Amino acid sequence: MKLLYLQTLGCAMNVRDSEHIVAELKDEYKLTDDISKADLILINTCSVREKPVHKLFSEIGAFNKVRKNGSKIGVCGCTASHLGEEIFNKAPFVDFVLGARNVSKISEAVKTPKFISTDINYDESEFAFGEFRGSPYKAFVNIMIGCDKKCSYCIVPQTRGKEISIPAEIILNEASKAVQNGAKEIFLLGQNVNNYGKFFSSRHEKMDFSDLLVKISEIKGVERIRFTSPHPLHMDDKFLDIFTSNPKICKSMHMPLQSGSTKVLRDMRRGYDKEWFLNRALRLRKMCPEVSISTDIIVAYPTESEDDFKDTMEVLNEVKFEQIFSFKFSPRPLTAAENLPLIDNEIASKRLEILQSRHNEILDEIMKNQVGKIFDVYFEELRANGEVAGRSFSNFLVSVKGSEDLLGKILPVRIEKASRMVLYGKITA
């Protein structure tokens, strides 16, 4: 068989798209880690910030230097969606370009010189994901495609198109097959998962996200359910009740804050304010004390003042997130905020440093407080020094001494030591 080298940048949805690519090519290609031997070299791209876009061109330039004669290079994903032909202009050695909603055309692209497809219109063939899984222990399952939110800073609606919910019967069938193949954890994917069910093609049965969670939890063999990314605006009482009460749903919630300032949130077109976010987050803490909450934060949005930044710090200190993904504002093409005057980079960098430093203090305290507790850990990863790692039900990364026979098992672990990112312990059974 021919050899495929595949590099994936960005979010879990890109990981699932890459799995789809491998499934589409499985009859002709098998994966390799050696790029110099690959017959086909693919990079699946991210465009949420400017840095991954720059990385694309540096990476494919490096690929071109080590590729073997006769091999092909393809660019897929979100950057392919919005740059399109420009990729050929900047890197004429690239053989084809496939947008984020066009990966099902990979077989055609490989066989067609200078093939390009960046259409973001709805096509029901997008629902037919292949069965290849990068991990035998958990299954990423798309429940929706695209986004209709139009946040002022975000390019995703321009790269992934309008929001469409995948019919529940397709999702449930995919989850059932994954469990039959050994997965114990189902990880649901979408830009705004808790808006699921708002936009179906008309002939499909209507179902909201809360009902979908219940249906998946009833599949025999499903032991854990995770999902990303919910939108704070759609965290209604029904959703919170099912999240906290269903024993199959992992008690970790990603709540993308973006800013703690009501003014900046309005400028970002987020649809909620500081008070709404705090109400949802603190209610969740009260309903489910063991929950871990992660978030996204953008500092130095063009309209962010010092007082606005202080509002963000207030939310950080009040919610005490277990994890934050924080970045300086990065202007993206085709967005409402693209041409707004930027805040001085020194000020932006300082705000990011203050935010991350304070969160490190919060995280150190959180991790220290886990010592002595017992967590059920789902082991998925071999680490260095004879260790095996996995995730607790609340999404803490836990590492123990052990061998590969632990992989795929859920076992109780008593936590004995904590670093900022990892808990260390011993299996108690």
UniProtKB/Swiss-Prot annotation:
Residues given in the record as [4Fe-4S] cluster 1 binding sites: 11, 46, 78
Record-annotated MTTase N-terminal domain positions: 2-115
A Pfam match: UPF0004
Cell compartment(s), UniProt: Cytoplasm
Alphabetic keyword roster: 4Fe-4S, Cytoplasm, Iron, Iron-sulfur, Metal-binding, S-adenosyl-L-methionine, Transferase, tRNA processing
Gene3D superfamilies, per the entry: Methylthiotransferase, N-terminal domain (3.40.50.12160), tm_1862 like domain (3.80.30.20)
NCBIfam families xref list: miaB-methiolase, MiaB/RimO family radical SAM methylthiotransferase
HAMAP family with a match to the protein in the record: tRNA_metthiotr_MiaB
Protein name: tRNA-2-methylthio-N(6)-dimethylallyladenosine synthase
Source organism: Campylobacter hominis (strain ATCC BAA-381 / DSM 21671 / CCUG 45161 / LMG 19568 / NCTC 13146 / CH001A)
